[in-house]
From Swiss-Prot:
Entry-linked Pfam families: ELMO_ARM, ELMO_CED12, PH_12
SUPFAM superfamilies linked: ARM repeat (SSF48371), PH domain-like (SSF50729)
Highest taxon of the lineage: Eukaryota
Positions occupied by motif SH3-binding: 707-714
GO biological process, one term: phagocytosis, engulfment
Gene Ontology cellular-component terms listed: cytoplasm; cytosol; glutamatergic synapse; guanyl-nucleotide exchange factor complex; membrane; plasma membrane; postsynapse
Sequence positions bearing N6-acetyllysine: K100, K105
Gene name of the record: ELMO1
Species, as recorded: Homo sapiens
Domain PH per the UniProt entry, residue ranges: 555-676
Protein name according to UniProt: Engulfment and cell motility protein 1
């Protein structure tokens, strides 16, 4: 008799019959189990039957995934994938509109299953669907007026099935005709079309562009930015998301020489202001997928600066040298050039050298040499010229202020601008490809057409202000840059909605404030390094670790919604996983949409006993990170990946929504297995809680009573005459 681990108790349904309770021996071939089930109901030709999950997924059971069957699973006996695919292939060609519609609806649902998808594709099903899209629209054109809902549903189900089938990566995108691309593009270009058809058409175009260079060129010929913009001005956030995704895909795959041209078109069509008005400042919350697409657009826009950032200045190029002359002219407003004589030439050179020194260049004789380092290359000079022309008063004030100071206290504008540009490029990761999972967009960068230049202008004035506050000398240059970086980073974390708000945040982060923050952190560190405190820490640390462990397990009991990602395109598909209250079982299952709150245990179809877990692996050790594809190459996805290994060659793969959830889950799973919690979050929590506990105990030594309840809220004043408007 096989060991209990190989026996799974399930219920099996068959239409028109009572469900059967059955024990499945996982060592038996699947065909033998299906034959046994068919014999129980006296059904012949068992090879025409298969088992599938009876939940909403309806996925077929195969030799590859049969290990996912757990005790208590409800299965359904149904026609085999090959039979089902053959029947649907015939039904969708029916002359009856109702029969065709029902068949396409079933096909759209079943195509999510890779087992069925493979069988349908083997029947050349993809070609059939593309033919229906290409010719079917004309064939039923006359029926639109009298059967418009039916026609719309039919096309919607056809496109849904196509998207699901292609998402499995079985068929190459390069196989599609120009006629099919034109037809899909025509749905996007129409001003009035069914929302579901538009959404799927946008998804298809995005995948075409991302997965095939040839298709990118064909799609780019059929779709213009002007045709996409009306979809951003609507109220449907999903359509807006897919529209921005198509724009991002076109941007990402465009040849280098086309990207700047495309950026100019986006500026002409006022894409930024449309997104700001209809998406960012719309009266609704921005969901994660939209935030991701906005982040991608932000990254791709800033990456246009990479060419200038990596371009060295040519000291012999007169046009480039003229920019430096212009900086000097604006700052010092030379009244008239000396007469062009041999005597005045030396005088002119001397005057230029003096002025270039005042401008803060390292090389006073030939400042062009300052811009030969990449990064930031010519981008620094571009920023300086923008500041001089568009913020002329501030530029002149900074230059003249510093030229009138003593040498050792002057803030060198030229050197500062070059180093600041380099620092801002590092902060914004200019030149790096967008992450698959990040959604860290900044609304303020969508409020101005020249947002990077304006960002620089604010920060160069901050640098000058901080320099004065620090009473810095040239030896303190690197220290000033470190303080400025800290100020900028702290202000950015608050996600200001505009550049003016960003400027206000920086006003509150003066050098004095940064010193207070640093001093507070340093004092806390020093106070807690004495020997008695270290001994006390060591004594209470196990208690704190147990508290952290319980918090991690409680979070696992609450559960988390994870996103399903693949290398081809992002999907709005979700699954949920949570730990049972007794910490014995992990419940998980697919979801149609992102949940609002917790998902009940009974609605999650699959179970994994904690006792079956063999190990938890992370990063590149995860099975789903070893597979070929774009995800393998993405560092940020790699840092969020972890897998649970159980049984033989079975795993449950995760990609956490963010670093915090990654730490929570890896800590919690390690705690379940009796291993140490090693995440950065655990270290931070341990430090915070230890610090708090020690402070409370020290207060107790001083006989200072900590109240159990917060102090009462005082009554409102009798009047508010003391309130005044400071403006």
């Amino acid at each position: 008799m096989p060991p209990p681990a190989d026996i799974v108790k399930v219920a099996i349904e068959w239409p028109g019959a009572y469900p059967k309770l059955m024990e499945i021996d996982q060592k038996k071939p699947l065909s033998a189990i299906i034959k046994e089930v068919c014999d129980g109901w006296s059904l012949a030709n068992h090879e025409y039957f298969a088992l599938q999950h009876a939940d909403s997924s309806n996925f077929y059971i195969t030799e590859k995934n049969r290990n996912e069957i757990k005790n208590g699973t409800i299965l359904r006996l149904t026609t085999s994938p090959a039979q089902n695919a053959q029947q649907l292939h015939e039904r969708i060609q029916s002359s009856s509109m109702d029969a065709k519609l029902e068949a396409l609806k079933d096909l759209a649902s079943l195509s999510r299953d890779v087992t069925f998808a493979q069988e349908f594709i083997n029947l050349d099903g993809i070609s059939l669907l593309t033919q229906m899209v290409e010719s079917g629209t004309e064939r039923y054109q006359k029926l639109q007026k009298i059967m418009k809902p039916c026609f719309g549903d039919m096309l919607s189900f056809t496109l849904t099935a196509f998207v699901e089938l292609m998402d499995h990566g079985i068929v190459s995108w390069d196989t599609f005709s120009v006629a099919f691309i034109k037809k899909i593009a025509s749905f996007v270009n129409k001003s009035a079309i069914d929302i579901s058809i538009l959404q799927r058409s946008l998804a298809i175009l995005e995948s075409m562009v991302l997965n095939s260079h040839d298709l990118y060129q064909k799609v780019a010929q059929e779709i213009t930015i002007g045709q996409l913009i009306p979809h951003l001005q609507g109220s449907d956030q999903e359509i807006q998301t897919y529209t921005i995704a198509v724009i991002n895909a076109l941007f990402l795959k465009a040849p280098d020489e086309r990207r700047q041209e495309m950026a100019n078109i986006l500026a002409q069509k006022q894409l930024r202001s449309i997104i700001l008005t209809h998406v960012i400042r719309a009266q609704r919350a921005i969901n994660n997928e939209m935030a991701h697409q906005l982040y991608v657009l932000q990254v791709l826009t800033f990456n246009l600066l990479e060419d200038r950032m990596m371009t060295k200045m040519d000291p012999q190029d007169q046009a480039q040298r003229d920019i430096i002359f212009e900086l000097r002219r604006i700052a010092f407003d030379a009244e008239s050039e000396p007469n062009n004589s041999s005597g005045s030439m030396e005088k002119r050179k001397s005057m230029y050298t003096r002025d270039y020194k005042k401008l803060g260049f390292i090389n006073h004789v030939n400042p062009a040499m300052d811009f030969t380092q990449t990064p930031p290359g010519m981008l620094a000079l571009d920023n300086m010229l923008y500041f001089a022309k568009h913020h002329q008063d501030a530029y002149i004030r900074i230059v003249l202020e510093n030229s009138s100071r003593e040498d050792k206290h002057e803030c060198p504008f030229g050197r500062s601008s070059i180093e600041l540009t380099k620092m801002l490029c590092e902060i914004l990761k200019v030149g790096e490809l967008p992450s698959e999972t990040c959604n860290d967009f900044h609304p303020m960068f969508f409020t101005h057409d020249r947002s990077f230049e304006e960002f620089f202008c604010i920060c160069i004035q901050l640098l000058n202000k901080t320099w004065k506050e620090m009473r810095a000398t040239s030896e303190d240059f690197n220290k000033v840059m470190q303080v400025v970086k800290e100020q900028v980073m702290r202000a950015l974390t608050t996600k200001p909605s505009s550049l003016d708000q960003f400027k206000s945040k920086l006003q509150n982060l003066s050098y004095t404030e940064i010193l207070k923050i640093r001093q507070s952190e340093r004092m806390n560190q020093e106070d807690f390094q004495s020997r008695p405190i270290l001994e006390l820490k060591e004594k209470i640390q196990p208690e704190i670790l147990e508290l952290i462990k319980q918090q991690r397990l409680n979070r696992l009991v609450e559960g988390t919604c994870f996103r399903k990602l693949n290398a081809r395109r992002r999907q709005d598909k979700f699954w949920y996983c949570r730990l049972s209250p007794n910490h014995k079982v992990l419940h998980y299952g697919d979801l149609e949409e992102s949940p609002q709150g917790e998902v009940p245990h009974d609605s999650l179809q699959d179970k994994l006993p904690v006792a079956d877990i063999k190990a938890v692996v992370t990063g590149k050790d995860c099975p789903h990170m070893k597979e070929k594809g774009a995800l393998k190459q993405n560092k940020e996805v790699l840092e969020l990946a972890f897998s649970i290994l159980y049984d033989s060659n079975c795993q449950l793969n995760f990609i956490a929504p963010d670093k915090h959830e990654y730490c929570i889950w890896t800590d919690g799973l390690n705690a379940l297995l009796g291993k140490d919690m090693m995440s950065d979050l655990t270290r931070n929590d341990l430090d915070t809680l230890l610090s708090m506990e020690i402070k409370l105990r020290l207060l107790d030594l001083e006989n200072i009573q900590i109240p159990d309840a917060p102090p009462p809220i005082p009554k409102e004043p009798s009047n508010y005459d003391f309130v005044y408007d400071c403006n």
